[in-house]
Amino acid sequence: MSESNVKHLISWEDWSDSEILDLLDFAIHVKKNRVNYAGHMSGRSLAMLFQKTSTRTRVSFEVAMTEMGGHGIYLDWMASNFQLSDIDLEARYLSRNVSVIMARLKKHEDLLTMRNGSQVPLINGCDNMFHPCQSLADIMTIALDKPEIPLNQIQLTYIGVHNNVVNSLIGITSALGIRLTLVTPIAEKENIHSQTVERAKAKGTLSWEENLKKAIQNADYVYTDTWLDMEFFNDPSYADKKKQRMELMMPYQINSSLLEKTNAKVMHDMPIHAGYEITREVVLGPRSIIFQQAENRLDAQKAVILKLLEA
């Protein structure tokens, strides 16, 4: 496989609508037929490079490789030479030893540099601009929750801060025809991927709403996320920014009172800061599909690995 022919998952920008739909269908197939893929990664290794903290991404990728007969290698950025060397050169070496690489980095630009050096498929396990694997599991969860309803009839409402998860949600929903409404009181320009937004606007799948009641009244799903990036949440140097954000965003909390105005089910990509963007009562309540959503990361990761190595 030459470098020019290697397929990566950095964002949905490099995937066609039909490729995204095919990947979604395949992820659902893998979940329903896990035993059929028990040995597909035999003799193969996945390098997992972490610059950001993780629970779900590490667990799901490592378990995915184990269940498929392969091996997941955990690499801590600070304990590796990625922190010392040119990223593309380290990636060029690493890709000579493994079949696929997953990287969870702070800067999207670093992931692009890593892609330029990798001779094997590179998966974005989350960066500051995109989180494609999360959005695949999100839509997989919706498709499994309402299999009788075509995706282009689904209304998804996101309430929170415009971030990497939102960019990936915009990309995948526009590809699949899902209507996405954003209620994003905080939407800083540097966090918005304009190409992704413009494509969705052109397709008519994306809209914005300031009235919270109007945004949720016809929603099938209400989705929220942390109001401050996880690596900064407990950082004392961000205390003032955190305080300002919490005060601004508290009226947009997902709570029982808000849910009285909608029949929507509730989603969150985790980790959760209960009492801020969502109450613990809602997280554990009957409308929550948050843990199904998190569980589906496992089969979504399997599907991504298998598809990229098949390409």
UniProtKB/Swiss-Prot annotation:
Principal subcellular localization: cytoplasm
Protein's recorded name: Ornithine carbamoyltransferase
Pathway given in the UniProt record: Amino-acid biosynthesis; L-arginine biosynthesis; L-arginine from L-ornithine and carbamoyl phosphate: step 1/3
InterPro entries in the cross-refs: Asp/Orn_carbamoyltranf_P-bd, Asp/Orn_carbamoylTrfase, Asp/Orn_carbamoylTrfase_sf, Asp_carbamoyltransf_Asp/Orn-bd, Orn/put_carbamltrans
This protein's record includes keyword Isomerase: no
Family: Belongs to the aspartate/ornithine carbamoyltransferase superfamily. OTCase family.
Reaction(s) catalysed by this chain's protein: carbamoyl phosphate + L-ornithine = L-citrulline + phosphate + H(+)
Gene this chain is encoded by: argF
